[in-house]
Each structure stands twice: as C-alpha cells, then as structure tokens.
Design a protein with these regions (language model features):
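ATP-dependent carboxylate-amine ligase
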Residues: 1-96
C-alpha cells in the first residue's frame, strides 16, 4: 500500500529511535506534509526536520507541524485536509 503524501503522526509514547527509519521511508515516498499530535509532538517535529535536512548535502523539503496537547487527532486531520495545491490529497494517520 502506497503512503499518502500527507501524514498525521499520532505519537502514543514519544520519540523512539525507530522513527528515523520511518521518516527515511517517507522521504523515499516523497511525503510532503507531516503533522504530529500527541506525546512529545514538538520534539518529534524537530527531529523530523533534522532528519529531512541530514548533513545538508541533499536536504528534503517536507512541511511539518505539531499540535499541542489541547488538540486532538481529529484537529490534526482537519488541518491536514485543508492543505491544497502541492499539498492536496488524502491524509494517512500513523500511530507511533
């Protein structure tokens, strides 16, 4: 199953090193947007940004956003659905 170009990452436990491989896969699949909601959402968003930049020799542009604890998964999905133009398309929710 192909990954959607927009992801809402629902963090259940905070950052874990396994996220690095997931983000690498999203880059290969040309995911354009990741919204993070849940535990450590801000930290996870920063880590995703760092992974996209890498060593700077071949950065990948991905729009990221985090949602604080007052926002739900449904709020994150709603925001992702509003994105248009190059960011239009289906939203996939990934629990991590």
């Amino acid at each position: 199953m192909a990954t959607a170009h927009k992801i809402v990452l629902h963090s259940l436990h905070g950052y874990r090193p396994e996220l690095d491989a997931i983000v690498a896969q999203w880059i290969r699949e040309q995911v354009k947007y990741v919204g993070v909601v849940g535990v450590d959402a801000s930290r996870i968003e920063d880590i995703i940004d760092e992974l996209c930049i890498g060593d700077g020799s071949s950065p990948y542009f991905m729009v990221t956003a985090f949602h604080d604890l007052s926002e739900s998964v449904q709020d994150a999905i709603f925001l992702a659905e509003q994105l248009s133009g190059e960011l239009a398309g289906d939203v996939q929710v990934v629990e991590f």
